[in-house]
Amino acid sequence: MTYSRKIKVGVVGVGHLGKFHVQQYHNINNVICMGVFDINSKEAHRVSEEYNIKAYGVFEDLVNECDAVSICTPTSTHYVVAKQALLSDCHILIEKPITDNIIKAEDLIKISNEYDKIIQVGHIERFNPALSELNLDNIKPTFIESHRLSPFNIRATDVDVVLDLMIHDIDILLNLVKSDINNIVASGVSALSNKIDMANARIEFTNGCVANLTASRISQKQLRKFRIFENNKYTNIDFLHHSQETYILDKHKPNKQSPHVIVSENQDKYIIYSKSKIKPYNALTLELNNFIDSILNQNKPLVSGYDGLAAIEVAFKILKQINLNNNK
């Protein structure tokens, strides 16, 4: 759909993620990228020169000239930056996690409602093509298992691994399992930082579904897998390689012989394997387009402020259990 109106956007924080936001905004038709702000003025000017946009020396000047901003600053600064942007009448896309504190997240949502502004939270895996292939309406998980492992990076150590990495899988989990949480058992350790670097959480839902989430930022290699078990069905999602495999248990023999059919010994059950052909695309482009479309159409974004709040509520429950175990 073509719109006559163009959204004036800015990017706050031009570190690792912020640079990608600037790059992708330049590819969206309904956007005018006004400029960037970063406390590192040298880096802000470097990005501004690369994309021929303005490097603002004062944060307030940027938000006062924009309709919307991406907030790509450290988590500890999210609340202050986002609040000022909302009060300056800006819609905001705020990188995950929404804040480092539940009360702060609730306050941002309250302000956004008062000013009729959109909050979108950057849980980018929701836009991963491997997840987008799923028909969420037909999924009834009984058990979910996720592993999200990453090599150590000093850049991400301002928060625990639960808020840094596991938060992605918490958000996806809450989107899949529409049920209250009954119990959480969790453990974690610090290894290379003064925060939790490795964590595991078992989450039990009132509808009987159980999830086991593992996250580590001290791995030798990356791994981002999410496994969904249903009655007679298993789905394996690889977020890193954008692939999805499905195994379905069926008592009906397929119409024709297939190399993707596994027959049990007594041949009364068939395991039918399939691997989706997923067309790759840039998830950030889709995320930013969703943000802009939400503004233009006044729609709820795919990942709202409420979704971001729900994710950190569970994350802090997990961290509470970890701290209780570590202090025994």
What are the language-model segments listed below?
Residues 170-245, 281-297:
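Contiguous beta-strand/loop segments that form the cofactor/metal-binding neighborhood of enzyme cores
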Residues 124, 232-302, 328:
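C-terminal glycine/acidic-rich active-site capping loop/insertion
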Residues 53, 88-90, 115-118, 209:
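A short helix->loop->beta-strand "cap" motif at the edges of active sites that frequently abuts
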Residues 99-156:
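A contiguous active-site-proximal alpha/beta segment in oxidoreductase catalytic domains
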Residues 122-129, 152-183, 196-197, 308:
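Mid-domain beta-loop-alpha active-site segment that forms a flexible
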Residues 1-3, 68-71, 286-328:
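C-terminal helix-rich "cap/oligomerization" subdomain common to oxidoreductases
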Residues 1-51, 173:
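N-terminal Rossmann-like dinucleotide-binding module
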Residues 21, 51-109:
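Beta-loop-alpha module in the N-terminal Rossmann-like domain of NAD(P)-dependent dehydrogenases
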